[in-house]
Amino acid sequence: AGQSTPLAGGMAIAQNSPVDVRLAMLGGLLHDIGEAYIQAQYLDGEEPLDLLGHKHMMVHPRIAQLLLSATTDYPATLCRAIGEHHERQNGSGFPARLSGDAISPLGMLLAAVENTMSLAPAPHAPLTRASFALRVVPGEYPDRFSSVVFNMARNAHEQVPTNIRVPAAAALHHVNTTLQAAQQTARALQTNIGSTERKAIVQLALDRIARLRQAWNALGVWGLSPEQLTPEDHFEMDLAGVELNQRLYELQRECMLLAENLTQAEKTELSPIWADLKVKHA
């Protein structure tokens, strides 16, 4: 929280953001207060949360919003934004899967702060990692906030690891084959038959896979031999593998959550989608 406060204030000041600096700093301080009501086993784990763990974690923004609304006289703008600090502009966040203008400017700022601070403990180049994470998938975060972290990383002159090597068939190759398989499966399941909810899950998978494909294609180092890649290139490819695998895992989890409202027959029919999206984490 100590670092989140000035970061939120700095983002509010930058580029004439339509956010009150004082509220931004207070939001940076308080945004994770809802985690006090989450079981410790679901906090700061080394492995990504499974579906049950995610269900526990995804309520903490809403808990914080309700807590602050009921026990303080803080403005509704601040309480709402704290409830939105895990949302993403493209609708891939939680708890409400909001998108676009449905997320308040302060909520979007706190979401960028949350993502940045989640990478602060990284042993090497945390700002460079955060800058990449905010920009790698188009549409997740507004440029006005990701550019702040990009400039911070550039001005920090962080040293990137020089001992990273990405084998030809490693993480990014796995991302590529996973995207291809999941896209093919989802396309095969497109039909006018079935419930509206079923159709929405298939369309969600296709839309999100297309975004991840766009991010994968934009890396710009394909066709180069390992000897032609700089340490910065190797580091970026390593970051891309981590971030894109994480997005695949999140999409799998989101599809499975939405499918809980389907009939058993439709769940079974769509299960190949999340089977294809299954990823391995180091």
Language-model region placement:
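Short alpha-helical segment immediately N-terminal to, or the first helix within
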Residues: 14, 119-122
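General alpha-helical segment detector with a strong preference for membrane-spanning helices
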Residues: 35-36, 95, 118, 146
